[in-house]
Amino acid sequence: GRIDTGNLAYVHELSDIESLNQRALKAELEVTAVSIHAYAYLHERYAMLNSGSSMGDGYGPRIVSLAPRPDYPRAALKGLRVAIPGPLTTAALALQLYQPACETIVMPFDQIQEAAVAGEVDAGLLIHEGQLTYADDGLHLWEDLGAWWLEDTGYPLPLGGNVIRRDLGDEVITQVARDLRASIEYALEHRAPALAHASRFNRGIGEERTDRFVGMYVNQWTVDYGVRGRAAVQLLLDRAADVGVIPARIRVDFVG
């Protein structure tokens, strides 16, 4: 109720990203967050909104293990069982670009850290708060895929974005884009109450880590991709297509 949305009403649904990816594949949702990886399969029905990105600028999904970090983690991952948070997550895509020869085990994102600690898998690919808490459980960082991607390409790693169904039409798309941007700007300008709201969903990591984690992925990149951010999205999907992780190159349409 902080933003004037005119004649549009929004119903907020909270869900994990892989569930949203799967629902978007069925075009169930008019506006939703999705993984950039998933957008390769959604682009005909959905356009990418310019606001709402989660960008890993020198950081991102982390590969962790009970075993200490080897000298050459990329090579060491060959043949190992790695838990991933869903086949259409961008974390899974980045892992395939980093080391396609590992064996991936799909499980809910909030069970991966526990599985790695229990030795049920050789390594886990962590998204969300696990990126900050893995060492508390005695896990070792093998690779930060966002740091690797920046070193490899010079670009941030685009993890997620907001999309809107094309059949809503230009007028509604324009208004939704405006409302979304306004809501993000409002949250950044009123950080304390926004963090208090976010803390309700932080899975027990405490205020300091919540503040840090939110700052990692809700920032000026979230307000607008900008030229560099849009190029980063296109580059990631081009790379994925070129090595056969996604079926073909696509042109990403940004709106708003």
What role is predicted for each listed range?
Residues 1-2, 14, 61-123, 129, ...:
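Bilobed "Venus flytrap"/periplasmic-binding protein-like clamshell domains
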Residues 4-19:
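A short beta-strand-loop structural module common to alpha/beta enzyme folds
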Residues 16-18, 27-40, 108-109, 126-132:
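Beta->alpha turn/N-cap motifs
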Residues 20-32, 40-54, 135:
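Short beta-strand-centered segments that line the small-molecule binding cleft or hinge
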Residues 48-72, 149-167:
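Hydrophobic/proline-rich hinge and linker segments of small-molecule sensing/allosteric domains
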Residues 108-200:
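Pocket-lining segment of extracytoplasmic ligand-binding domains
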Residues 169-239:
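Secondary-structure end/capping motifs
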Residues 239-256:
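Conserved C-terminal helix/tail region of periplasmic/extracytoplasmic solute-binding proteins
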